[in-house]
Amino acid sequence: MDKNSEEYISKKRAINLWDSGEIDDFEIGSVKGLLDIHYALFHDLDGFDAGKIRKVNISKGNFRFANSMYLGPALEAIEQMPEDDFDQIIDKYVEMNVAHPFIEGNGRATRIWLDLILKKNLGKCIDWQIVDKVDYLEFMKISPVRSKYIKMLLKEALTDKIDDREVFTKGLDQSYIYEGLDEYKAEDIDSQVDK
């Protein structure tokens, strides 16, 4: 087990955030909260510029994320979006995905951010382990113009098991699978002596 790999280190940090209860200390639904989550997961890792808003333009495939020149105002507007019901929360999540405020690690940090918003406002979270990778990535890709599909997919995966560690750790594994990272399972990291 390569304990120096980005996947191992950041997954272990996420597990430690859960186990220590620090995951509940982040400012929920805010840009600051997302920056803090990103920093907690990825600080000291190459290529992340952890916890800092990107200053360069980025794209994935044919999709260009928000222009870095307008990222500040865009993030302020996203932060002000309402979070009163499921649809509003997912709309906010979709907009944050379009903004893609970081150079790397957006998806993993933002999925934790989303779950914290859902937990606070609805007493629910997403059981990510049952959200199919292909469907999720495809529906996120079209979500800026047609969010109903990602809403349907995520609504089917809602659970009230917000304090269930296994839902969190298996969801963490799935979150990394979406990013093509599946060398380490959370349960294997968890069993390591050097906690």
Q: Over which residues does each language-model region extend?
A:
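FIC/Doc superfamily catalytic core
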Residues: 1-195
